[in-house]
């Protein structure tokens, strides 16, 4: 990736950390009675495609944002749940859908709609579509208490990271205002004086553990993989020092994916990270390969904690469709100047997988080179033994020639 292209995402990420708007208050009412109140500032980090590759954009919730009345509701008991929809700009929508049980309520789902035809935020975008992304959230509180979170709340969607700041949210209000009692988010945690700070992750962790992945679609399995993954990330810390750290992908992370005619995706995620691997296919040569990597991640000690990178022009882990790619040697896949993906002990097969088993193996060049080393050493030793044997026979013949027969 060219240097200007690498600097632009970093600059946008820095701007994302600085673009903190003031908190705004939003209310949903029914016949003049308030049922939902929410106060927060928000930003939306996403990527989009241009002719020059992926771009990152950070959109702040403007002061002009308002409640969309025909998209918000107090809900009806046993019929529908309350929802808050905020509208701004050219077709942007943020929706919070609430639900409750006997003791707690929560934001069960969050939706964000954005418009790629908006040239102010998406200049030179190839697509002009309107997209809606969604995710579940960890926003929950006790009934008759307000949910309070001073820290950033990050909600990771497929191609969007929503960040809420300085948030107070309450649904199912019993009065027309926030309750004095509050349920605090886990991010705020205890006071820092109650214990020592958490240590930073090690610069170089141990090698990752091999994980098994399986992606199934309507026509059966489209991806079978066994591999250990490690992220090598370079970022700017809060003290303005640049550091490179390695993060292992755990077998305990949640995996999912999708099967398409020309694209197979594998998504591996936990509460702080979403990694997506995209496999493409060259139909003319009947080859599959890793063509794209997308990462959204939280880095707590970074100057800009939200880290988002993608590259869709890769060509790695390549093999014939119907066969599996295998490599025992560690591979380093360059994604950008800020991210590389390290792959260990990989065997992967995409698009065509019969009976949920790997097909014929196509080994990587690196493994072939590694096999040459013991062969060369063995050949050298055999040659040395042969030379010693020849020298011995020549020496023995000469010693016999030195005596005369009586």
UniProtKB/Swiss-Prot annotation:
CDD domains found in the cross-reference section: TM_EGFR-like (cd12087)
Keywords, in A-Z order: Cell membrane, Disulfide bond, Endosome, Glycoprotein, Lysosome, Membrane, Signal, Transmembrane, Transmembrane helix
General function of this protein: Lysosomal membrane glycoprotein which plays an important role in lysosome biogenesis, lysosomal pH regulation, autophagy and cholesterol homeostasis. Acts as an important regulator of lysosomal lumen pH regulation by acting as a direct inhibitor of the proton channel TMEM175, facilitating lysosomal acidification for optimal hydrolase activity. Also plays an important role in NK-cells cytotoxicity. Mechanistically, participates in cytotoxic granule movement to the cell surface and perforin trafficking to the lytic granule.
Record's subunit section: Interacts with ABCB9; this interaction strongly stabilizes ABCB9 and protects ABCB9 against lysosomal degradation. Interacts with FURIN. Interacts with TMEM175; inhibiting the proton channel activity of TMEM175.
Cellular component per GO, a single term: vesicle
Record bears the keyword Signal: yes
Record's comment on post-translational modification: O- and N-glycosylated; some of the N-glycans attached to LAMP-1 are polylactosaminoglycans.
Segments traversing the membrane: 371-394
Glycosylation-annotated residues: 31, 52, 58, 70, 78, 97, 101, 115, 159, 177, 214, 219, 232, 240, 252, 282, 296, 311
Pfam family, one: Lamp2_2nd
Organism listed in the record: Mus musculus (Mouse)
Chain segments carrying region Second lumenal domain: 219-370
Hinge as annotated region, ranges: 189-218
UniProt xrefs under InterPro entries: Lamp2-like_luminal (IPR048528), Lamp2-like_TM (IPR048524), LAMP_CS (IPR018134), Lysosome-assoc_membr_glycop (IPR002000)
Ranges per topology, Cytoplasmic: 395-406
One BP annotation, GO: protein stabilization
Biased composition (Pro residues): 193-205
Region First lumenal domain, residue ranges: 25-188
Family affiliation: Belongs to the LAMP family.
Disruption phenotype: Deficient mice are viable and fertile. However, mice deficient in both Lamp1 and Lamp2 are embryonic lethal, with the accumulation of autophagic vacuoles in many tissues. In addition, LAMP1 deletion results in increased NK-cell apoptosis upon target cell-induced degranulation.
Protein known as: Lysosome-associated membrane glycoprotein 1
Ranges facing Lumenal side: 25-370
Gene Ontology MF: a single term: ion channel inhibitor activity
Signal peptide (residue range): 1-24
Covalent S-S links between cysteines: 35-74, 149-185, 222-259, 327-364
């Amino acid at each position: 990736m060219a240097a200007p292209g690498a600097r632009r995402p970093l600059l946008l990420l820095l701007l994302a950390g600085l673009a903190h708007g003031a908190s705004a208050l939003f209310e949903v009412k029914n016949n003049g009675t308030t049922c939902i109140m929410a106060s927060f500032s928000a930003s939306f980090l996403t990527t989009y495609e241009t002719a020059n590759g992926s771009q990152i954009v950070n959109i702040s919730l403007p002061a002009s944002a308002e409640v969309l009345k025909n998209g918000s509701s107090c809900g009806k008991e046993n019929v529908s749940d309350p929802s808050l929809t905020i509208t701004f700009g050219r077709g942007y929508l943020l929706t919070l859908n609430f639900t409750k049980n006997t003791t707690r309520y929560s934001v069960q789902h969050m939706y964000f709609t954005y418009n790629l035809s908006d040239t102010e935020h998406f200049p030179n975008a190839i697509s002009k579509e309107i997209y809606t992304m969604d995710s579940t959230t960890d926003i929950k509180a006790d009934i008759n208490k307000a949910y309070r979170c001073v820290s950033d709340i990050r909600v990771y969607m497929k191609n969007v990271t929503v960040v809420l700041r300085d948030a107070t949210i309450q649904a199912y209000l019993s009065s027309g205002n926030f309750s004095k009692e509050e349920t605090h988010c886990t991010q705020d945690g205890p006071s820092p004086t109650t214990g020592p700070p958490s240590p930073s992750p090690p610069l170089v962790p141990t090698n990752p553990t091999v994980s098994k992945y399986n992606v199934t679609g309507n026509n059966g399995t489209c991806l079978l993989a066994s591999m250990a993954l490690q992220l090598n990330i370079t970022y700017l810390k809060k003290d303005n020092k640049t550091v490179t750290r390695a993060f292992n992908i755990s077998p305990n992370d949640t995996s999912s994916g999708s099967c398409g005619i020309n694209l197979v995706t594998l998504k591996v995620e936990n509460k702080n990270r979403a990694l997506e691997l995209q496999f493409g296919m060259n139909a003319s040569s009947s080859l599959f390969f890793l063509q794209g990597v997308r990462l959204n991640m939280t880095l707590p000690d970074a100057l800009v904690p939200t880290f988002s990178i993608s590259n869709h022009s890769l060509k790695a882990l390549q093999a014939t469709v119907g066969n599996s790619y295998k490599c025992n040697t560690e591979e380093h896949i360059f994604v950008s100047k800020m991210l590389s993906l390290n792959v260990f002990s990989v065997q992967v097969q995409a698009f065509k997988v019969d009976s949920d088993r790997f097909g014929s193996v196509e080994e990587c060049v690196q493994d072939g080179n590694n096999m040459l080393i013991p062969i060369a050493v063995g050949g050298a030793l055999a040659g040395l033994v042969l030379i010693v044997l020849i020298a011995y026979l020549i020496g023995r013949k000469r010693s016999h020639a030195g005596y005369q027969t009586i």
